[in-house]
Structures are given as C-alpha cells and as structure tokens.
C-alpha cells in the first residue's frame, strides 16, 4: 500500500501534522523568521494571483490558514515593530482576516509552565492541557509556534532524555490531533 504523501506547510522543511524544532544561537533571527512564516501562511496569496512564489527561508509556502504564535519573550510593542518591518505598507496584514493570532505573553502575565516534573516524572501540566483544548477548537489551524521552548518548561529537556521525550511527545500529539505544523524554537549556546 502506498503511503500518503507529505503535506507541507513550508515545502521540504515543515510538514503539516508534525512537530518541528527551529534551533539557533540567540540573536540569529528565529523569532523574526517564524513571524515571517506566520504572516505568509495566515495571509495566503494576494487576490487574483497564484500561490506559487510565496517564500520563507527560500522555500515555498504550501498551506494557508490560521496561525497561532505564542511569544514568551516579545512584547506587543516588539511584535508590532517586527510586523511593521516585514510589512510596512500593511499590504499583507490587510489580507489576514483574523488568521494571525500572536500572543505576546509579557503583556498578559508571562509564560505559563507547560511542562514540569512532579514526583520525579516529567510531563505536561494542566496549563498545557487547557491550551491544547483551546487550540483544537480552531478549525483551520495550520501552524502553532512556541517561541522559545525553554520559557514554557521547568523540565531539563536539553539534558535529560525522559524530559525531552515528554515535551516532544506532547508537541507531536498536538500536531497529530490538529493537523497543524507545531514549531518550537530553541536557543542554542553560543
């Protein structure tokens, strides 16, 4: 039996229904790149034009729909400046139709702990469960971004395999349940 082909969000890079990691040293532009991807995916093609040609990271965007970016370190003002630098004339943002949801956590009480260790067991918290339930209600969800991963975890995911497995397993389950691409960014040491 022939397997189903990969459904790409960003061709040959990020797949729908899968979890992915974007890792680089601090200051490399991960947040800006993910916001650029979110903007392109949420806006879709310009009316009257073909989708082909929309690119991020030199790859074609292959899906459109609702994008949720949960930004643990960027304030609303910072997000607005970044969006302005990507789309100064608002040509792209006028096409969003509410499909780009950016949650600037510094403005709403900070990042919730989504993964913790309880009685020696690493796993998701009730905050993760609640967030997952809300995300699963978005019918055309195609991209969820957690930026950066460390802000949401009190588990040692970068030094203990069991902690990493708990986090990646939960992210993969969210992607499988929603059909969206789930991307987490991670700061690597310089």
Set out the residue ranges of the language-model regions.
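Hydrophobic positions on the alpha1 helix immediately C-terminal to the Walker A/P-loop
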Residues: 33-37
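Substrate-engagement module of ASCE P-loop NTPases
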Residues: 130-137, 164-188
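Conserved glycine(s) of the Walker
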Residues: 29-30
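Post-Walker A helix-loop "phosphate-sensing" segment adjacent to the P-loop in P-loop NTPases
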Residues: 40-64
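N-terminal pre-Walker A segment at the start of P-loop NTPase domains
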Residues: 1-9
């Amino acid at each position: 039996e022939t397997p189903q082909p990969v459904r790409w969000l960003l061709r040959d890079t990020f797949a729908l229904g899968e979890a992915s990691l974007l890792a680089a040293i601090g200051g490399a532009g991960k947040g800006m790149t993910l916001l650029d991807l979110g903007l392109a995916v949420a806006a879709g093609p310009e009316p009257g034009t073909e989708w082909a040609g929309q690119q991020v990271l030199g790859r074609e965007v292959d899906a459109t729909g609702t994008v949720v970016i949960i930004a643990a370190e960027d304030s609303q003002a910072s997000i607005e400046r970044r969006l302005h630098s990507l789309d100064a004339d608002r040509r792209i943002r006028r096409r969003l139709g509410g499909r780009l949801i950016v949650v600037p956590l510094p403005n709403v009480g900070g990042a919730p702990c989504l993964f913790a260790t309880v009685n020696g067991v690493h796993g998701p918290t009730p905050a993760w469960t609640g967030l997952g339930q809300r995300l699963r209600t978005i019918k055309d969800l195609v991209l969820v971004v957690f930026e950066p991963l460390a802000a949401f975890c009190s588990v040692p995911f970068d030094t203990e395999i069991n902690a990493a497995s708990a986090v990646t397993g939960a992210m993969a389950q969210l992607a499988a349940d929603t059909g969206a691409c789930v991307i987490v960014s991670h700061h690597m040491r310089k």
